[in-house]
Amino acid sequence: MRHLRKISDYAIIGSLGALIAVGLQGCDNNSSSKSEPLSQIKEKQGALVIIEEQPQGGYKILEEYPSETTRIVLKDPSGKERMLTQEEVDKLLKEEAAKIEQGTSQLTNPGGMGLSLGETILASMAGAMLGSWIGSKLFNNPNYQAQQRATYKSPQAYERSQNSFKSSSSATAPRGTSTGASSTPSSAKGGYFGSSSSPSSAPSSSSSSSSSPSYGG
């Protein structure tokens, strides 16, 4: 994507959040200004999600922005950041799907504390794209809806996310249609980048894969 530098060029992505948002949203302002429901917005585009591991345990969504493809960046307590691979995300989502089936996911239980990395991904905007195959077992659950907002690092981060996805949708989506690459996530069944194949196991320490699609534009 021409407006988004490759992730390897960033020293600290979080500090460049505003720049990323401007680049991703520099679109035609002559489109319809009518806001669309977030459920429709999520189906039309991907998301760049920056998740921060908390020193006391658990994870929080630091920032997230609309993107043509869905990517997850993990920031550890020391400030080091890396992109999760397709295999890592597929493995996390497979584990979370099993927990949801068993009724043990903190996303579907009231008062859940210290969400796992997989649960945090599913609570982000990326969750509706990457975890669409989980369906109503998660996204129509009232406990999930209550947990989602608390997963963000701050109320301001939540509001920025909501506003950026609404703004991007109204600026880029043609009336009544969805466009090329941005429509792919709605049909995703399990793969990180919209692959319909079954999630595969992956080494937890891997940060890149020769068979994975390119992350950058």
From Swiss-Prot:
<keyword id="KW-1003">Cell membrane</keyword>
<keyword id="KW-0449">Lipoprotein</keyword>
<keyword id="KW-0732">Signal</keyword>
<feature type="lipid moiety-binding region" description="N-palmitoyl cysteine">
    <location>
        <position position="27"/>
    </location>
</feature>
<dbReference type="InterPro" id="IPR020913">
    <property type="entry name" value="UPF0323"/>
</dbReference>
<feature type="region of interest" description="Disordered">
    <location>
        <begin position="150"/>
        <end position="217"/>
    </location>
</feature>
<protein>
    <recommendedName>
        <fullName>UPF0323 lipoprotein WS0575</fullName>
    </recommendedName>
</protein>
<feature type="signal peptide">
    <location>
        <begin position="1"/>
        <end position="26"/>
    </location>
</feature>
<feature type="compositionally biased region" description="Low complexity">
    <location>
        <begin position="167"/>
        <end position="217"/>
    </location>
</feature>
<feature type="compositionally biased region" description="Polar residues">
    <location>
        <begin position="150"/>
        <end position="166"/>
    </location>
</feature>
<dbReference type="GO" id="GO:0005886">
    <property type="term" value="C:plasma membrane"/>
</dbReference>
<keyword id="KW-0472">Membrane</keyword>
<keyword id="KW-0564">Palmitate</keyword>
<feature type="lipid moiety-binding region" description="S-diacylglycerol cysteine">
    <location>
        <position position="27"/>
    </location>
</feature>
<comment type="similarity">
    <text>Belongs to the UPF0323 family.</text>
</comment>
